[in-house]
């Protein structure tokens, strides 16, 4: 009985912890660099805007961020035209290689992995395809407007590529579909949020496009790429204080995090048959703990009586 109770208690404790962990992040996890302020990588709960400082990137400026299907974070340093890979544990970034063929003067940049698995960069009104292993760059063509952010989700009727972009500066607030063969941007409409610069990325699990504005303070928001409706507008906060200066965004698929990020333990997925919805894990835990304690305290007494018989 004692062993059974201990096993049950252990499983319920794990279930309760998973339930609380799932509640802690109601939306997808985003990553962004506060490049206009401290050059640190931050983890952001996109449902609430609550940010956590991960660490210094080690680069003067990171304009675009993207996350691969394997959870690796990539970024672009415009001043040196480098593709970098960033750690979700320390925030430190390391150069992958030089992006060839880019103009000397780089401005706002958008970076994302599309649903076809390719990595795309928008910079200086040109769209590029990038090899994430070598940083080899191929220009697809002019986008027309200068894009500040790119997001890759599933294709839609109005955007067969599933690659979306958002304008900045003179094209602020405008939402586009990007042709992955020519780089051309087709205007889909205008959004309510219209920052001069924006970080953008998509959640492949839900099809939603997420953004973060380079305002003071910054705001996170979600875009339905079909209806163009905007929701979940929240101010970015750090320890309860509103902050800004973000110019990039990488969104991890809902329920996951970047490689090495301790907020979601990979081992948790290996624990079988433990429901995590609702409040029952905590209630069951409250019931089983007293029973386990009773079994533990009574066991020595029972053994002692047996020895004296």
Task: Enumerate the predicted regions with their spans.
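N-terminal signal peptide c-region/cleavage motif recognized by signal peptidases
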Residues: 21-22
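An edge-strand/N-cap motif at the start of beta-rich repeat modules
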Residues: 26-49, 163-165
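Conserved beta-propeller blade signature
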Residues: 29-34, 72-75, 118-122, 128, ...
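Short loop/turn segments that connect beta-strands within beta-propeller blades
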Residues: 45-48, 86-91, 130-135, 179-182, ...
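A short beta-strand motif characteristic of beta-propeller blades
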Residues: 50-57, 92-102, 136-142, 184-191, ...
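Repeated scaffold domains used in trafficking and secretory/extracellular systems
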Residues: 60-68, 103-113, 144-155, 194-202, ...
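A cross-kingdom C-terminal cell-surface attachment/processing module
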Residues: 279-301
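Cytoplasmic C-terminal tails of single-pass
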Residues: 301-309
């Amino acid at each position: 009985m004692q062993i059974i109770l201990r096993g049950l208690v252990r499983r319920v404790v794990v279930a309760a912890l998973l339930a609380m962990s799932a509640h802690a992040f109601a939306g997808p996890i985003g990553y962004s660099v506060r490049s206009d302020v401290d050059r640190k990588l931050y983890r952001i709960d996109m449902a609430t805007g609550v940010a956590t400082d991960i660490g210094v990137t080690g680069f003067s400026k990171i304009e675009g961020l993207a996350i691969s299907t394997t959870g690796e974070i990539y970024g672009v340093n415009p001043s040196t035209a480098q593709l970098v890979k960033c750690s979700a544990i320390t925030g430190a970034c390391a150069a992958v290689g030089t992006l060839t063929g880019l103009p000397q003067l780089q401005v706002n940049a958008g970076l994302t992995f599309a649903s076809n698995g390719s990595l795309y960069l928008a910079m200086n009104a040109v769209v590029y395809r990038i090899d994430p292993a070598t940083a080899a760059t191929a220009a697809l063509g002019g986008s027309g407007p200068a894009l500040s952010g790119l997001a890759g989700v599933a294709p839609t009727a109005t955007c067969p590529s599933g690659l979306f972009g958002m304008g900045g500066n003179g094209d602020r607030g405008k939402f586009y579909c990007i042709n992955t063969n020519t780089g051309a941007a087709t205007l889909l409409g205008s959004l309510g949020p219209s920052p001069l610069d924006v970080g953008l990325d998509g959640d492949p699990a839900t099809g939603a496009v997420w953004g973060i504005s380079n305002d003071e303070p910054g705001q996170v928001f979600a875009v339905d790429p079909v209806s163009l409706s905007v929701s979940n507008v929240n101010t970015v906060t750090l320890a309860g204080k509103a902050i800004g200066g973000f110019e990039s965004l990488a969104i991890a698929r809902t329920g996951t995090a970047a490689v090495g990020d301790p907020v979601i333990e990979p081992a948790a997925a290996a624990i079988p048959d433990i429901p995590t919805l609702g409040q029952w894990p905590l209630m069951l835990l409250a019931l089983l703990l007293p029973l386990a304690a009773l079994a533990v305290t009574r066991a020595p007494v029972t053994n002692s009586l047996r020895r004296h018989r």
